[in-house]
Each structure stands twice: as C-alpha cells, then as structure tokens.
Amino acid sequence: MFPSFPPGISGDEFNLLFYGYQSQEEIRALLQNLSLAVSNTALELPSGRKLPLRLSGGVSWYPENSTDLSTLKKYADFAMYQVKKAEKGYITEFDLELFTKNAKETEMRRLFHRMLNEELFTYYFQPIVSAADGSIYAYEALMRGNLPALTRPDQILQLAHEEECLHEIERLTMFLSAKSYATFLSTHQIRGDELLFVNSIASQYMNHDESVAY
C-alpha cells in the first residue's frame, strides 16, 4: 500500500510509504525487486539511443529511526543523498552515526566561514633568538582561530582546502600578521627592527592588487 502523503519531492525524487507489512525484510525484498526492475529498464531517446535507468534511494524505519513523519522523510532523504554522493544506483538505509557526523561537519563549515567573514584570527608571535648574543632578532607569526570549536591551524587549513578558501587564508594571514606587528610596535611590545616570518601557502600567493594593498 502506497503513500498516504504526496509522493513527489522535486524533479525525479519521490517519497514512498510502505506500511502494513509483517517485517522489514518484506519491505527490503520489495525494494530490491523495484531496484532490479528499474535497472532493467531503458528510455529510448529521439535519436534512437537508449538511456539506462538507475534507482537511488534512502530508507528510514518507523519506529526505530523516528516516530515523526517529517523526521522519517528527512532521514530517508539524507540516506538517499549519501548514495548520490558516492555511487548512484542502489538503496541504503539511514545511519544515525553518519547523520550525526555530517551534522557536526556542517556546523564546522559554518563556523569556518564565519571565521573568514569576521576575520576571527589571532597571530601569536614566537620569538626567534640569536645564538650569538641571545637577542630576539625575529618573530614567527603563528595562526590560531578565535572560536572555541575551531582553534588549531591544521583544522583551519583542512577546512580551507575542502571549501576552496586557501587563498583567503593566505591573504588574511599576510594582512593580519602585519597588522599585529604594527600593533605590537605601537604599544612598545617589540623594538621594530625584528624580522617577521610568516608561514605562506606557496600555491596561493597574493595577486597584484592584494600585493599593492599590502
């Protein structure tokens, strides 16, 4: 028996509600047969070329995953998109652990973009001491994030790589470390003749306009 709510989601996506069965295994067998039937079907295009069909789907279970219909739909939708992200053409069941992990990753990405937009970085200056006389002749600028969940440079750089924001990290590092140097100089925390070493991303050097502004 199918569905008691509108099946269409968008485009080629649909909801199906299976109920009245004695076990999950019965439904799994039906889904397997449905997937097989679709995979054995092809659409013939006007050119005569045949386009094979594949079925990608996600399954959530009542009451194991949730007793709320909208939540069950959301969980099934999440499972389906995991299929589409990996290898299309099969049906998978909702995984709460994967869903929780994905939610955490989404939140970390949101925090990362907030960090970029609001420039929430601090650059600590690690002194470099001369072996000859013990004086400080340079500082190395060490980046730290200002959000509790996102402080370590390796976390920040990994997210920057995944979100294709390495250039923005490079630009901010150059400008904000120089700004920190100027602040320390104006407050007499450094002499002003020390060198400043900055860890740069070799493939992400500043463009002409950024270099002029710097």
Mark where each language-model region is.
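Catalytic-core segments of nucleotide cyclases and related cyclic-nucleotide turnover enzymes
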Residues: 28, 47, 62-88, 154, ...
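Flexible, glycine/charge-rich interdomain/linker segments that couple
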Residues: 63, 82-107, 191-200
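Catalytic core regions of nucleotide second-messenger enzymes
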Residues: 7-9, 38-55, 84, 185-194
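Active-site core of bacterial EAL-family cyclic-dinucleotide phosphodiesterase domains
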Residues: 104-161, 199
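Conserved helix-loop-beta segment at the catalytic/binding core of cyclic-nucleotide signaling proteins
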Residues: 1-24
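Catalytic core of bacterial c-di-GMP phosphodiesterases, primarily the EAL and HD-GYP domains
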Residues: 135-137, 166-214
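Catalytic strand-loop-helix junctions within cyclic-nucleotide turnover domains
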Residues: 17-27, 46-50, 54-72, 97-100, ...
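Catalytic/regulatory signature loops of cyclic-dinucleotide turnover enzymes
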Residues: 73-95, 111-122, 146-150
